[in-house]
Amino acid sequence: MKKIALVSVIDDDRFFQYSTRKIIEATNLVEKLIEFPDGEIAIRYFLKHKDEEQMLPDLVFLDLNMPYMDGWQFLEEFTANVFKKELITIYISTSSESKYDRDKFESYPKLKGYLIKPMTKLQFQEVLENELKLG
């Protein structure tokens, strides 16, 4: 069965990371999962490996509200750099339903979706299956 090689979760909520890991593992659609507790640690990893395609995720679930570097700051850094892997799909995964965040989401055409927490196993399954079809 075809699988997504690498998925990343960037979120400071340990419970969300844990539950997401369990759900993603249960789908059996992902080879490897890498987790980051904030945008700063994530962008440092991305920049360190920007020329190593196999080290960069195919799919990212990005929280907006995190300490140190939030999701929007991560996206600013991410879009300002060139990565060897051109197609890194990013979904916003947040509890924010604010108009400001929704409008800002629309200003990033490369963002694939805006998912409101808590997310169900079915939502994750649909995202992963859709990415496999497109990949």
Task: Kindly label every feature range from the protein language model.
Residues M66:
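Receiver (REC) domain active-site loop signature in two-component systems and cognate sites
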Residues M119-L128:
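C-terminal output helix
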Residues R44, W72-K84:
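Short amphipathic alpha-helix used as the core "switch/output" element in two-component signaling
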